Regions:
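Ser/Thr/Pro/Gly-rich low-complexity linker/stalk segments immediately outside membranes or between
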Residues: 47-56
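Structured, non-membrane catalytic/scaffold regions adjacent to prosthetic-group chemistry
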Residues: 56-318
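N-terminal secretory signal peptides
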Residues: 1-22, 49
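N-terminal secretory signal peptides and thylakoid transit peptides that target proteins
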Residues: 14-37, 41, 230
Length: 318
């Protein structure tokens, strides 16, 4: 089989055409106003090359992880040139170019809410909190395509424990930076900005939940969520917030971006589930670079998390 380079792949070849067009139509017709002004985050207009993460910069001291899959890894060029990152563009091929000058230094992560210790870390201090691990994870998009990526990071729980959450902290909310001067997609009201995602506390504390700052042994490329993101491999990709600047602990379920945009299609949990159809069938997926579709696995094949949802109706609690 001839495998195309990512630069040769059109979005409609991987995502079913009707789904791709329907999602674009939905986004184009949305009119969400006012939310962007509520954020307190901003960055300077001018960019300095010395303040950007260096492409191809190696990460030292990476350890292998028993949590990794042994499946074939998707080529680096494909993963870095086929991106859903609406802060830059709704076209998957465009974030790589539009994000090349995105400034990731200096970068501060604020942690607050229902915690004993309200913290502010420089991103490099966050990275040094624990030994980096390579986690080779399956990544499944709600649109029906998938990839396998060797992420680099450590369990999100390591950072959470530093803040010492209070007993009333039931959820964790993640907020992406709001920087329309650097992120052209944020100048359009295709979604409510800044991007917000959330997890239940036990989900965030699960060993599989990854705080990620690299992939393929190198620092994260800007178009893949630099400098800091989460990777939640048993959920659809939009649950894995990118370019995080704020982590908040709360006793109530966060109002998340895609759930606000279209609740029936983007549930708060959004666990990978072949038996729950959102706006299209989720029974099959197409691995990037492959011709034949493959059956979707429950929880994306990560059965370790099944106990988190014991007794829950996963169709109702999608």
């Amino acid at each position: 089989m001839l495998i195309k380079k990512a630069s040769d792949i059109r979005s409609s070849e991987i995502t079913p055409q009707d789904l791709y067009l329907n999602r674009r139509k939905f986004l184009t017709g949305m009119a969400v106003s006012g939310a962007a002004a509520a954020t307190g985050f901003g960055v300077k207009e001018l960019l300095s090359p010395s303040m950007r993460a260096s492409a191809g910069q190696k990460i030292d001291g990476i350890q292998k992880s028993a949590l990794s899959t042994t499946e074939k890894i998707t080529p680096y060029n494909d993963v870095t040139h086929y991106n859903n990152y609406y802060e830059f563009s709704t076209q998957k091929e465009e974030p790589a170019g539009l994000a090349k000058d995105f400034k990731t230094r200096p970068w501060t992560v604020k942690i607050d809410g229902a915690v004993k210790k309200k913290l502010e870390f420089g991103v490099d201090d966050v990275i040094k909190l624990a030994t980096p691990e390579e986690r080779i994870y399956r990544h499944r998009c709600v649109e029906g395509w998938s990839i396998v990526v060797p992420w680099v990071g450590y369990s999100l729980s390591e950072l959470i424990k530093k803040a010492e959450p209070l007993g009333k902290a039931k959820y964790v909310e993640f907020t992406t930076i709001y920087a329309p001067n650097q992120m052209p997609g944020q100048r359009r009201e295709v979604l409510q900005w800044p991007y917000v995602e959330g997890l239940r506390m036990d989900e965030a504390m699960h060993p599989l939940a990854l705080l990620c700052f690299g992939m393929y042994g190198e620092v994260l490329p800007n178009q893949d969520g630099a400098p800091l993101r989460v990777v939640i491999p048993w959920k659809y990709g939009f649950k894995s917030a990118k370019a995080i600047v704020h982590i908040r602990f709360t006793d109530s379920q966060p109002m998340t971006t895609w759930n606000l945009a279209n609740p029936p299609a983007y549930g708060f949990y959004s666990n990978v589930n072949p038996n729950v159809d959102t706006y299209h069938s989720q029974a099959y997926e197409r691995r990037l670079g492959e011709f034949r579709p493959r059956p979707t696995q429950m929880f994306n094949g990560y059965d370790q998390v099944a106990g988190l949802y014991s007794g829950m109706d996963l169709k109702k609690n999608y």
